[in-house]
Amino acid sequence: MAAHWLVSREALEKVGVFSRLFPIYGNDDNWCDRARFHGYKVGIVPAARAVHDRAYREEPKEKVIYRNYYMGSLVRLCDINRPLWERFLYVCLFTLVKAVKYGSILPFKHFRSLVRMLPEIRQARQAFR
């Protein structure tokens, strides 16, 4: 899925650009969380249409787990609208649920990566306030 944006210059200057913590997925969610933190409203225009020129392709299970679990967890940890401890607790539970759902230990491996990133996540959360 791709996002198509209409953002004022003022909002872009106040909220900032995409975070470098998100190499590809999760940027849009993180930016919207930060915009809400700064008092901006985020909306969807159901009648708007845009085309994202991307061919459908099957993805390996590992890539789906990475995108759905790891990037989703990273978005949650970076949400400056809620305390980090609350987000971390949520991600701990989310890890267990996803491991059972996928029948895989990959969420636990990704969880370790997220724990190692906590200092950088704390720094990013502070920088975007």
Identify the meaning behind each predicted range.
Residues 33, 75-76:
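Active-site phosphate/pyrophosphate- and oxyanion-stabilizing loops and adjacent acidic/basic residues
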